[in-house]
Amino acid sequence: MILAAPTGAGKTSLVTELDPTRFEILSFDSRQIYKNMSIGTAAPTKKEQSKIAHHLVEVLSPSEAVDAGLYNRLAEEALQKVLNLDKIPVFTAGTGFYLKAFLFGMFPVPEIDVSVRDRVLSMSKEEKKNLLKELDPNALDKIFPEDDYRLGRALEVNLMGEKWSRLKIDPNTSAICRYDLDIRLGVFLDLDRKELYERINLRAKQMIEKGMADEAWKIQERFGETCPGLKSLGYNFALENKKGNSNLETFLADLSRSHRNYAKRQVTWFRKEPYVQPMGRSEALERIKHMK
């Protein structure tokens, strides 16, 4: 089954109420896959993971780049482990793109020349945005502004002569291409916006109180400020605070706003997807619990 939700909606607290002898969790989250970043990514705690098995959580070093191809391979390995145990895999999705790539297949992107890749790697994030806006303005509407990886990939595709915004995962988006999977239920946790934003604001405050700035600094000291893990949402604000360039009030405001904006994009994404149905937490929990 699929359980999709924006950041802060309460996916983890819901799945910890499931029967661990029947279900295991496969997390599709581009941030929670990193080790030693549990505060800023709100990864399931050790206690929460002890209640029900989670896969694809805290498995990569912050120094490792992640993309849909790597995620697919890791997810396939995890899926087979769960199926071999004769349990029901629950796909929890915050990063809709990775889940969709797993279910529908990968984008048919052209092969990228080394010279093109080197050129893009040498560019700053702003330079990438500006050039992408010139070559393929529609692509920017589909990419989270802080997602440097996808900005780079979109630009590479355009520089190879293809419009990234025109690429399709599958022409028939009403059917899942993983015919080996029996998707019995697809849920999108659809919270009232006011409630969701209040939850996000509280979570941002708790992240700061738990030491997100120190967590970011340790990652920066060990792997460098440009490591892939630190491109995760909000860590730029954590580093700015740790460097003394922002106070706690500014840090909280920036972190909360970035998470609200991210959640808004997630909601927009999942409301357009035909494989999930919007429903409240209580209904979703009951529907999942009674799956056979």
Swiss-Prot record:
Cofactor(s), by name: Mg(2+)
Binding site for substrate: T7, G8, A9, G10, K11, T12
Transmembrane segments: none
Binding site for ATP: A5, P6, T7, G8, A9, G10, K11, T12
Molecular function GO labels: ATP binding; tRNA dimethylallyltransferase activity
Catalytic activity of the protein: adenosine(37) in tRNA + dimethylallyl diphosphate = N(6)-dimethylallyladenosine(37) in tRNA + diphosphate
Database matches in InterPro entries: Dimethylallyltransferase, IPT, P-loop_NTPase
HAMAP family, sorted: IPP_trans
Family indicated by similarity: Belongs to the IPP transferase family.
Record protein name field: tRNA dimethylallyltransferase
Species for this entry: Leptospira borgpetersenii serovar Hardjo-bovis (strain JB197)
Gene name, Swiss-Prot/TrEMBL: miaA
